[in-house]
Amino acid sequence: LNPTYGTVTLGQPLEAASILNRLQAIAKVPLLNTADFEAGVGFRIAGATQFPRLMAFGAARDERLAEEAGRITGEEARALGVHVNFAPVVDVNNNPRNPVINTRSYGEDPEMVGRLASAYIRGLESAGVAATLKHFPGHGDTDVDSHLGLPIIKHPRSRLDQMELVPFRAGIAAGADAVMTAH
């Protein structure tokens, strides 16, 4: 395990908690454990709660459900020893040619994305897990998968302020602890 970066494949919940506890015990400084639990802990760990992708929450337009998903994800993450969740996705799904965001987004309305993300953040952080907004400055209106190429938003700053940045501002106001840049 590199002192500044490590990755562990987490299997079942008990196995994951055991691995993270052992790593924490042997670390010379306390570890800050992070994970990508976009759709619940079950998104990465078999046997934990897995939620539908965020678009389902957007279709329901129910902040209470988004907050509850955040709370459950946070409680399960903390039980494993995870401190930071790389979620929620706050990209606005406004380009049908986008090959990677689509169902990972709450939807095409930036205000609604901001409201649902804020509710999720409240739930996640009520369980003691830090939230990470992603993918700054927005990956919704691109047509390239950032895992395979460099996505570019070809709009002026004024358009970013009206669309892509709206959910980021809402998430920051709700208390998000981190922002992940597009990659």
Report residues per predicted region.
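Binuclear metal-dependent hydrolase catalytic cores centered on His/Asp/Glu-rich metal-binding motifs
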Residues: 144-162
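N-terminal beta-rich core of secreted/periplasmic extracellular enzymes
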Residues: 1-135, 165, 169, 173
